[in-house]
Design a protein with these regions (language model features):
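Well-ordered beta-sheet/strand-loop patches within structured domains
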Residues: 1-189
Length: 189
């Protein structure tokens, strides 16, 4: 089934990123680490977005892993160097916090902009995916993500809703809760 294939693909992609260590300045490249999604590599057929619709393809569902990793990278206050959103909303992360990935297509990359190594820890248990980024806490700062979601209307027919727009902000606070910075992370339409 598509659900079983998706679960296998999420487990397999999580296993491939688990344990990756990035030294200062190194860039994590999701497609390079996970590799080409093929049946020979163990990936299964499951639902994926392509060409404006849901299709069945080998590796479908791995964007849940890339999206969970993206959220972990944001909360670790790492530098996102490449990310494209899905053409439709996804149900596993908040609006505007989903990077779509595809072999030979959209990419997701982030840079370890810290002065120390970081490690990706990914696991699946009972069909739940958890991803953490381990590193050294040097100042006690923390990140909160916020987003502003609005309806997009047709320019030709102003009363017709044609989509949704999400603007995502990264808010960095010091250990005492004082806002240090608020950065527009991305706009998803």
């Amino acid at each position: 089934s598509s659900a079983a294939g998706r679960a296998t693909n999420v487990e397999l992609s999580a296993a491939k990123i688990n344990g990756v260590v990035l030294n200062p300045g190194e860039v994590f490249d999701y497609n390079a680490v996970v590799g080409k999604r093929t049946a020979e590599a163990g990936f299964k057929v499951a639902g994926a977005y392509a060409g404006g619709k849901v299709v069945q393809e080998v590796g479908g569902g791995i964007c849940q892993t890339s999206s969970t990793l993206y959220c972990a990278a944001l909360f670790a206050n790492l530098e996102i160097t490449q990310r494209d959103c899905h053409m439709f909303a996804v149900g596993y992360v908040p609006w505007g916090m989903d990077p779509t990935v595809s072999w030979g297509g959209p990419e997701f990359r982030f840079k370890n902009n810290r002065d120390y190594p970081i490690k990706i820890v990914a696991k699946t248990e009972n069909r739940e995916l958890t991803i953490e980024i381990w590193g050294t806490d040097v100042d006690g700062s923390y990140v909160e993500m916020t987003n502003s979601v609005s309806t997009v209307y047709s320019s030709k027919y102003p009363s017709v809703a044609v989509g949704t727009k999400a603007i995502t902000y990264r808010n960095v606070y010091d250990k005492d809760g004082k806002l240090l910075s608020r950065t527009k992370e991305d706009v998803s339409v």
